Amino acid sequence: MNSSPAAKPVDGALFDMDGLLLDTEIIYTRVSQEIVSRFGKTFDWSVKANMIGRPAIDSSRYLVETLNIPMSPEEYLAEREELLKRYLPQCQALPGAEQLIRHLRRHRVPIAIATSSSQELFAIKTRRHRPWIDLFDVVVTGDDPEIKSGKPAPDIFLVAASRLEVAPERALVFEDAPSGLQAGLDA
């Protein structure tokens, strides 16, 4: 007979941000499609699925090579950054995200954001959501000097757990991307 393993108590929660707390994926898709369409290419799920949750330079390299577009990953990133700064301030919270964070805060559960986004893009994305984003005890961004490797490496979740003063094995990770899920499991 298969029985579910007993639930283990947790001492803290670690959250990815893009596509989990904030609905930014639609904006990233729009921006990428806007760039690659100039070269007659399509940014579809087969490409996007391999980019979600990875550091920006790795994702950009994958896109440029896979779609064979005539620009360097750095050029793509620079153009993408400008477009993101225009569109990201309008991103919406995903349904239930704010309520969950407020619930955890009321129950004194330590919470952290562990996002691959840079500090600059984090600030742009969260500007409209500060009343509940500020409830997080810790925010770790992808450009944090302690992060040696991006997702799927566990670094970002290990740093977030450490700053929360929670043992990684006693933290619950909330993730939506395959690379992030692997990072959470490895942490």
Regions found by a protein language model. Give the residues of each.
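Glycine-rich phosphate-binding loop signature in dinucleotide/nucleotide-binding domains
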Residues: 6-8, 106-109, 164-170
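Active-site neighborhood of HAD-like aspartate-dependent phosphohydrolases
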Residues: 2-49
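Short helix-capping segments at alpha-helix termini
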Residues: 38-41, 67-71, 130-135, 165
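Substrate-recognition "cap/lid" segment bordering the active-site pocket of phosphatases
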Residues: 90, 118-172, 178-186
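A metal-dependent, Asp-based hydrolase signature
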Residues: 52-83, 103, 109
